[in-house]
Amino acid sequence: MPLSRLIINNFRNLQSLDLELSPNFNFIVGHNGSGKTSLLEAIFYLGHGRSFKSHISNRIIHYQAEDFVLHARIDEGQHQWSVGIQKKRSGDTLLKINGEDGNKISDLAHLLPMQVITPEGLTLLNGGPTFRRAFLDWGLFHQYTEFYSCWANLKRLLKQRNAALHQVRSYAELKPWDIELAKLAEIVSQMRASYAEALRPEIEKTCQFFLPELEIGVSFHQGWEKGTDYAEILAQGFERDKAMGYTMIGPQKADFRFRANGLPVEDVLSRGQLKLLMCVLRLAQGEYLVAQKERQCLFLIDDFASELDPIKRELLAHRLRESGSQVFVTAITKDQLNQMQWQESEQDSLFQVQQGMLTK
């Protein structure tokens, strides 16, 4: 679902922008600090209700303003949506879809599936399991309508159980939580396992295209020993969990691991190879969504040239163009975009950014 128009007011140093966007490639060129990454951040915020750079909203609002406002028009065939979000310094958030209040961030996220590729995105590979669970859960959110409610209820029950561990004296007092928790844990873990298995050949095939010199393997770990009863594990671990003050084993510990030639990728790959593998994972997941759901996936790529050699840049650009996705790419100079053939397509848009102002 491409964005055809984007309006930004008081988002970081972007005080007032109204942009008509290409459904194909949108290139944003400017020096560091000019505001090009802030443009990607604003698009990401529209689709997630949060930033990929800061968890503190007041740092995102322009220093002379009391709020920021983002508005976009989404086009898909004969359908069109108008979406908007306002964030105030007080913390209040107003979200509208087609002029109507009462929507949730998850409603916006369903309308705007997007993948973001940034220099900080290597945490997907060298960070903790949290980042890789988020990777899996993004795909599940867009793949299965029932996943979000199961996942949200699971998080709620885990939070309640952890709080109860500080209060209960015997396991009998905790058991009602565990009955429901075990059911949801099994459901969510089965969804994760099925999705991981379906995505695995897509990842391996895409890795072969970009990294033929490496044998990349992927594996899903549900967070407790496979083939065992999670309800029994909760019961047996009660005293340990109570002593620690939280639930130590379960779906909140799940992981999606990547190995290169049999070894953990973070131990054997160079930083450039890790960057390329991260791009491959995002691309494979976005392409899988398009194939399964026949929906477009937006790609936000910050600092395109960073740590990718010209050949790999050209391969990535080729695959993105083949996918038919809407892509937003930032670069410091136009020369860094040469592998994207930006001069050759009249349907692409190129924006120059300087001190928060954009010109075509």
From Swiss-Prot:
Name of the encoding gene = recF
Which protein family is named in the record? Belongs to the RecF family.
Q: List the GO cellular component terms.
A: cytoplasm
Protein keywords: ATP-binding, Cytoplasm, DNA damage, DNA repair, DNA replication, DNA-binding, Nucleotide-binding, SOS response
Give one GO molecular function term: single-stranded DNA binding
Report what the protein is called: DNA replication and repair protein RecF
Q: Which GO terms describe its biological process?
A: DNA replication; DNA synthesis involved in DNA repair; double-strand break repair; SOS response
Superkingdom, according to UniProt? Bacteria
What Pfam families does this protein map onto? SMC_N
- Listed binding positions for ATP are 30-37
Function noted in UniProt:
The RecF protein is involved in DNA metabolism; it is required for DNA replication and normal SOS inducibility. RecF binds preferentially to single-stranded, linear DNA. It also seems to bind ATP.
The answer to whether keyword Ribonucleoprotein applies is no
Q: Which InterPro entries match?
A: DNA-binding_RecF, DNA-binding_RecF_CS, P-loop_NTPase, RecF/RecN/SMC_N, RecF_2
Q: Where in the cell is it found?
A: Cytoplasm
